[in-house]
Amino acid sequence: MYFPIEKPDVWGIFKKRLNRFVGLAEIDGVETLVHIHDPGRLQELLFPGAMIWARRKQRGKTQYYLTAVELDDELVLIDPAAHNKVTSWLIEAGFLLRGYAIERYEPAFGKGRFDLLLRGPNGQRALVEVKGVTLEAGGRALFPDAPTSRGARHMEELAKAVTEGFEAHVIFLVFRKRAKVFSPNWEMDRKFAEALVRAYRSGVYIHAVKLEMFKWGLRYIEELPIDLLAL
């Protein structure tokens, strides 16, 4: 069983990143602009000469939408727009949170929104926030790879949801094949790491799910152990 991914239209060679959301790549022998939906730094993936896969866009200033990076022996998904669908598949297929049903997408809470609202096997309401992980170092999957005040705020809101009677979960989708354990990236963003630890101590459940990408889909591999301590 696997999660299907829309087949990219083209492959190319990455040249450089122009800003958070735009990169320059050579596709079919022509330098062209590529939309990068992931705001992370992605320095270990998007380096000059990296092979990328992309879909054509119908409108906008960029001609292509980055889908994945192909390294020597692994494909890495770079498409945050797919994260909620992947998580829904994991739940519906019984790989994660068995017995839960998806009740709503992007439910409102406080002044913002989470990714999913679930109904648990005992009727409990469960709010879910999903994060994608593309950084791996020494077998350790790390999030985030760039400071994220928004991510820290999400953790604080999950903790608040627990006090208001919700069950709360944060799910980290890990897209690196060598990852053996998940940790918050204390060195990159201590505020997020501290917020995640506080959320855990407040009763928020933390999951890290390892997925392997192939052409063209994702396989569930395993849930990774969580190490919240500062390295």
Swiss-Prot record:
Which residue pairs form cystines in this protein?
Answer: none
Family matches, as InterPro entries = SfsA, SfsA_C, SfsA_N
Q: What Pfam family is a match for this entry?
A: SfsA_N
Q: Which NCBIfam families match?
A: sfsA
Q: Which organism is it from?
A: Pyrobaculum islandicum (strain DSM 4184 / JCM 9189 / GEO3)
Judging by the UniProt lineage, the source's domain of life is Archaea
The GO terms this record gives for MF are: DNA binding
Name it.
Sugar fermentation stimulation protein homolog
The UniProt entry's sequence similarity note says:
Belongs to the SfsA family.
Q: Gene name on record?
A: sfsA
